[in-house]
Structure formats: C-alpha cells, structure tokens
C-alpha cells in the first residue's frame, strides 16, 4: 500500500491492495478491518507528495512552492511509515493470539490467494498486453528513482522535473507518435481535473484577498485567540487539522480556513510555508471522513461496515498524526512557539 500510494490516487491503492490481500485475510480468518486500516493510513501518509491533493491545495492556497512544503516533510513521512509498519506488526501479533494455530487442508498454500466464498465485487483489472513493457521494467524503475531523488534534492522546480520525466518515459515506452497521442488522450482527464482545481483555487483565493475578506477574517480570528496562545498557532493548526479535515472537505479547509490561519500566524512570525506543513498533519484522520469518496470504495471492496472501519481506525489514525506532529516539531518543520519581532 505504501508503494502503490506514491501515485497519489487512493482509489488505485485500495483496489490493488484489497484485490490481492482480502482473499488471504479471509483464508486465514483474519479481521479485514486491520487491512482497511493499514491501507488507509498508508494512503494518508504517502498522499503528502507534491502531486497529491493536500499538498497541492496548501501550496496553491498560500501561494508557496510545493517543493518547499514537501522536501522538509520527507523525514516526517519516514517516521510515519515506521510507525505504520510497527502498527502492522502489532496488529499481526494480536491476530495471531486471537486465532492461535490454524490447520489448513493439504494444498491450501497453492490456493492462498483464491477465495471461493469471497465477495464478487472485487475489481477485475484488464490490462492491454500491447501496452505492457516488461523488458523496460528496470529502465522505468531507474527513471522513477532518478525523478524521486531530483524531487527531494530540489534540482529543478517540480513542474519542470515532471515534464522532463514524462517526456523521457513517453519516448522510451511508446516511440510511435500515434500511440503517444492515445496514451496522452487516455490520461488527459486526470490532468485536466487537477488543472481546473488549481484555476478554481486561484480564483477563489483571489476573490478573498482582493475584496479584503481574508484580512478581515484574520483580524477577527486574532481577536478571539488569547495573546498567550497566538505564538502556538502552528501547533494549534496541526491539531485542529484532525477534526477540521474530518468534518469538512479538503477544499473547504485549505482554501477557506488555512489562509485565515496563515494570515493570523504571520503576526506571530510564523511563515505561510510553515503553516502549510502544519496543516498537513491531520491527513491520516481526514481519510476516515464520510466526505472522502475513495473510503467508500475501500470498505465496499473489503465488505466491511463504514462505521466499523471508522471506530476501528480512528485511534490508530490519531496516533499516526500525533507521531507526525512530534516528528515535525523535532525536525523543525514549524515552530512550537512563534518568533515575534
């Protein structure tokens, strides 16, 4: 789930993870809620990449570079990944104690990934064999690794790096010009939706700023924040991002609430990029929100109740968020106390 989530699409992660792991869980009589919980947490952490939704929204809303937000977040994501792996190990031990020693019939290992009584709604992924490039596996892996290293090192602006890597990958894998057109046309919808989001965000934030609403709302917010709590606004933003992104959409939080908090925080010496990093801490909890469509796909494919998934996963998602908050403060991604003057 951690590797698949690098594409920034939770739906893809859930389809692949559930299709491959649910039959094994059912065969071993394991709790499917642990699978949905771990898949969701992995998606929540890895979705902090610059091409993921939350980081792009925060960067657009506060007019900062996505690379300035993401690169310092890499160590925090590493700590969160370790926490998720430790949690997976602990949940596995708990399942072992619950189930004890299982006796499987002879030859069961040959069919471990097949469940005759499993759900019928698992996705059937049809792949056009003509589009596959197994001989170029290591070439594509090397190109992806080079792109990731360049992103972390900040060699060039993020859009330039992605355009260069995309052009190289397209030429290597599909040298025929007609096939290149078909590949671009097939995936153009995903690109256009993101571009539309950025334009809409720019219009929305422009209206808020140009009419003076952001300034007025920030002054109102400053008025209700006790002077003693103002310097802690970055940490407060990180904490309130858990319930805020649960009860409202990412668009509402990042384009409506975050600019106001950021404007108020500047009075305490906290920069917009630091506020953007703080606002991303609550993303693992956000994926439990009933406003997230991909979560319905996850519980539907796994055959579990949405409420059961929320009750089971909330404490673990909160724990991962708190680990990320502690790591972010330890690595200095945003200050615990603002720098006044």
Question: Where does each model-flagged region fall?
Answer:
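Small-residue-rich segments of transmembrane alpha-helices in multi-pass membrane proteins
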Residues: 43-49, 109-111, 190-204, 259, ...
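Long, contiguous bundles of hydrophobic transmembrane helices that form the permeation core
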Residues: 71, 75-183, 301, 336-341
